[in-house]
UniProtKB/Swiss-Prot annotation:
GO BP: any one term: ribosome biogenesis
Sequence ranges assigned to domain OCT in this UniProt record: 355-434
Family according to the record: Belongs to the TRAFAC class OBG-HflX-like GTPase superfamily. OBG GTPase family.
Cell compartment(s), UniProt: Cytoplasm
Subunit and interaction comment: Monomer.
Species, as recorded: Thermosipho melanesiensis (strain DSM 12029 / CIP 104789 / BI429)
Protein name (database record): GTPase Obg
PANTHER family from the UniProt entry: DEVELOPMENTALLY REGULATED GTP-BINDING PROTEIN-RELATED (PTHR11702), MITOCHONDRIAL RIBOSOME-ASSOCIATED GTPASE 2 (PTHR11702:SF31)
Superkingdom of source: Bacteria
Purpose: An essential GTPase which binds GTP, GDP and possibly (p)ppGpp with moderate affinity, with high nucleotide exchange rates and a fairly low GTP hydrolysis rate. Plays a role in control of the cell cycle, stress response, ribosome biogenesis and in those bacteria that undergo differentiation, in morphogenesis control.
Gene: obg
Residue span, OBG-type G domain: 163-333
Cited SUPFAM superfamilies: Obg GTP-binding protein C-terminal domain, Obg GTP-binding protein N-terminal domain, P-loop containing nucleoside triphosphate hydrolases
InterPro entries: G_OBG, GTP-bd, GTP-bd_Obg/CgtA, GTP-bd_prot_GTP1/OBG_C_sf, GTP1-OBG_CS, GTP1_OBG_dom, GTP1_OBG_dom_sf, OBG_GTPase
Chain segments annotated as transmembrane: none
Length: 434
């Protein structure tokens, strides 16, 4: 994977499909002169789902599109034929993707199991056909409902890598070399800071235990505040159960391993208290550059300052690496005992009810002034104006009947309307008459 291919945060827009409109058709058959209404219901709009896929390691393909709009439901047809439901969209994302609402920051889902599925935008419910409006007083209803709009929202997708062990430490202390030595990872390695611009993942096998190690780049003093790209990558350490802190014990490039250790520790604490509490060991790398006496003195100083178990190693010669691998395996195994979670594979898609705005219990009419004109408004009025097809004679009549039955004329008088004044209802102008 090239460096530019790694995308771990993206903002996308999702929208469920609109419900299809109900039909206002009538039965037309030979020898059936009064066939009556036979308009079918509209289909429901399609949904948008996110699905965790362990074969993906980046949000790149999601970022390339950014807008995901499900298919609308089909309109109802004659002969009581129901419109087809709109097709769903299923967006595959990497395992470990956290889904947040862009407006509120609320976490909607944490897709931490392979095959896990979450609905992020519901489709609108299809409108009813005229067969639902037939009554003793309306035998040939030329009326149907429009389908509801689908749910829409902006989402933040953040990838938090699902690694068991996180490697932290200043740039150029040997993290990339270490992960390539202990695993199947093949990172690009060079001798300058910020060599690694993406987290490298490697799989380590110890006897019957397999675990994932992540090399977390960009950590320096001030990382939690954005220095050196550190805040971009710190969230990838959050899921790790074990932290391996690598320091350059040689100090040949002017580094002080004790100061370096505490610089990074403070950044972990600033970023997350939970992160700072994770199990940690120290790997003192580059011991091949020191004499025996210098090494013993520096290792003791580091242990005294940190109180942490410390492993002298040389990634170059391989000395001490085996001991670190087995210690990591022991810590991962212990952590897995404490956090036993079953895998969810091919999880059944849970489909909530389609969007259909529930009307308030009480029909409230609001009258607003717009200059000399009067505007009829209110949740009930606005919803019925959307729901009924006002271009249909009976739909329009039913809408006006609802308003009049709930005191429209009295409300207008109370608001000061006089004979001849202009009243706006659902985008149409009427003349008020006493």
């Amino acid at each position: 994977m090239e460096r530019s291919d790694f995308v771990d945060r993206v903002i996308i827009y999702v929208k469920g499909g609109k419900g299809g409109d109900g039909s206002a058709s009538f039965r037309h058959e030979k020898y059936v002169p009064k066939g009556g209404p036979d308009g079918g219901d509209g289909g429901n709009g399609g949904y948008v789902f996110l699905r965790a896929n362990s074969n993906l390691s980046t949000l790149l393909t999601v970022a390339e599109k950014k807008k995901y709009i499900a298919e609308n439901g089909e309109n109802g047809k004659g002969k009581k034929m129901h419109g087809r439901n709109g097709k769903d969209i299923i967006i595959d994302v990497p395992l470990g993707t956290v889904v947040k609402d862009f407006e509120t920051g609320e976490i909607i889902a944490d897709l931490d199991k392979n095959g896990m599925v979450v609905c992020v935008a519901r489709g609108g419910k299809g409108g009813r056909g005229n067969v639902h409006f037939k009554s003793s007083t309306m035998r040939t209803p030329k009326i149907s409902e429009r389908g509801a709009e689908g749910e829409e929202r902006k989402l933040i997708l953040e990838l938090k890598l699902l690694a068991d062990v996180g490697l932290v430490g200043y740039p150029n202390v040997g993290k990339s070399s270490f992960i390539s030595k202990i695993s199947n990872a093949k990172p690009k390695i060079a001798n300058y800071p910020f060599t690694t611009l993406i987290p490298n993942l490697g799989v380590v096998q110890v006897d019957d235990l397999q675990f994932v190690v992540a090399d977390i780049p960009g950590l320096i003093k001030g990382a939690s505040k954005g220095v050196g790209l550190g805040n971009v990558f710190l969230r990838h350490v959050e899921r790790c159960s074990v932290i391996v802190h690598i320091v350059d014990i040689s100090g040949f490039e002017g580094r002080d391993p004790v100061n370096d250790y505490f610089d990074i520790r403070r950044e972990l604490e600033y970023f997350s208290e939970d992160l700072a509490k994770k199990e940690e060991i120290i790997v003192a790398n580059k011991i091949d550059l020191l004499s025996k006496e210098e090494l013993e003195e520096r290792i003791q100083k580091l242990k005294n300052a940190t109180g942490k178990e410390t492993f002298p190693t040389s990634v170059l010669t391989g000395k001490g690496i085996r001991e670190v691998i087995y210690k990591m395996a022991e810590m991962v195994k212990e952590s897995k005992k404490l956090n036993v979670e079953g895998e969810i594979v091919n999880e059944r898609v849970k489909r909530p009810k389609p969007i259909w705005k529930e009307l308030p219990e009480k029909f409230v009419i609001e009258i607003k002034r717009d200059g000399d004109d009067f505007v009829v408004a209110g949740p009930y009025v606005e919803e019925w104006a959307k729901r009924l097809n006002l271009t249909q004679r009976d739909g329009y009549n039913k809408f006006m009947e609802l308003l009049e039955k709930n005191g429209l004329d009295n409300k207008l008088r109370e608001a000061g309307a006089k004979d001849g004044d202009t009243v706006w209802i659902a985008g149409r102008a009427f003349e008020f008459k006493e």
